[in-house]
Amino acid sequence: MNVPATREDLMIVNMGPHHPSMHGVLRLIVTLDGEDVIDCEPILGYLHRGMEKIAENRTIIQYLPYVTRWDYLATMFTEAITVNAPEQLGNIQVPKRASYIRVIMLELSRIASHLLWLGPFMADIGAQTPFFYIFRERELVYDLFEAATGMRMMHNYFRIGGVAADLPHGWIDKCLDFCDYFLTGVAEYQKLITRNPIFLERVEGVGIIGVEEAINWGLSGPMLRASGIQWDLRKVDHYECYDEFDWEVQWQKEGDSLSRYLVRIGEMVASIKIIQQALEGIPGGPYENLEIRCFDRARDPELNDFEYRFISKKPSPTFELSKQELYVRVEAPKGELGIFLIGDQNVFPWRWKIRPPGFINLQILPQLVKRMKLADIMTILGSIDIIMGEVDR
């Protein structure tokens, strides 16, 4: 009779880069003692495309189609940060209507991103049904995007000084209908998921991050707010016109995977509130501002001198980025998305440093999975919400 051999030594397992629950081309080298995780080393770089270097050889308007490939599930945010940086450098005033349209698009994009987090996260821990439900609502968001921008994904909609096109006729009514419908959808998710005993068994108390830990690791977004810190850049930085709307920052105290789920569910409802207020109060007026005032040039006494240049919508060289440094950030669905921009009196940026939320949030993964079970890696990694396009850039 053959006696099964038992191994006493540690086992090293490669998870990814092709594993379906890796959310892209992430590779984890996991050291196991039976089912217990002893060590975990993430290997990055499989999706590196040199996004920062490409930016240094493009004007901002030429670079806009590239940025939607960072976080390809929340493309409006990457576009927003790309146009916000030169707007602040050039002191460009965005018309009120354009600002409202931007907020609506950003919040719709946040909902689409959270939906496509929720489905695969539930599939990772064994619940297949919500994966199909979320596509029903996400499809409606993409229909709205397609009607307004012409593209379902990779919209290329934001422009320096405004947006590419105004909202089409009937779009606002269609969006209001979606808001009413989506609230019933969220209630359905909560009924299906939140009190499910198997779900709670898998997420409650798994991957706990304390307040000090969250701050020291530089976490942001739902990862930070699930640990009891009420930090949302929409409230902190007062960008666009978020101050004009009534909404609450979503947060939880426990810091586990369940808290991160609850924060994101709450954020989807808060986003609907913001969208409804923006749609009801959207002002008239232009949707773009095509001129930039030049305050840094000496006055020329000639009679026909213009003190402003026009911002081109074509991919030709636009205005020069003045010689200064600037850090701009927005509250993306995954956390703080930032750009460190150095201008050099040139149409190209001298340096374009991207601060992706996923890359920084992912750093805490090895610490969270140590002394946990192998199956908990999926739960913890899923609750972080990463997209490898922005991690590897």
UniProtKB/Swiss-Prot annotation:
It is found in: Plastid, Chloroplast thylakoid membrane. Pfam families: Complex1_49kDa. It catalyses: a plastoquinone + NADH + (n+1) H(+)(in) = a plastoquinol + NAD(+) + n H(+)(out); a plastoquinone + NADPH + (n+1) H(+)(in) = a plastoquinol + NADP(+) + n H(+)(out). It is an enzyme of class 7 (translocase). GO terms for biological process: photosynthesis, light reaction. It comes from the Eukaryota. InterPro entries: NADH_Q_OxRdtase_suD, NADH_UbQ_OxRdtase_49kDa_CS, NDH1_su_D/H, NiFe-Hase_large. One of its GO terms (cellular component) is chloroplast thylakoid membrane. HAMAP family: NDH1_NuoD. NDH shuttles electrons from NAD(P)H:plastoquinone, via FMN and iron-sulfur (Fe-S) centers, to quinones in the photosynthetic chain and possibly in a chloroplast respiratory chain. The immediate electron acceptor for the enzyme in this species is believed to be plastoquinone. Couples the redox reaction to proton translocation, and thus conserves the redox energy in a proton gradient. This is NAD(P)H-quinone oxidoreductase subunit H, chloroplastic. The lineage of its organism: Eukaryota, Viridiplantae, Streptophyta, Embryophyta, Tracheophyta.
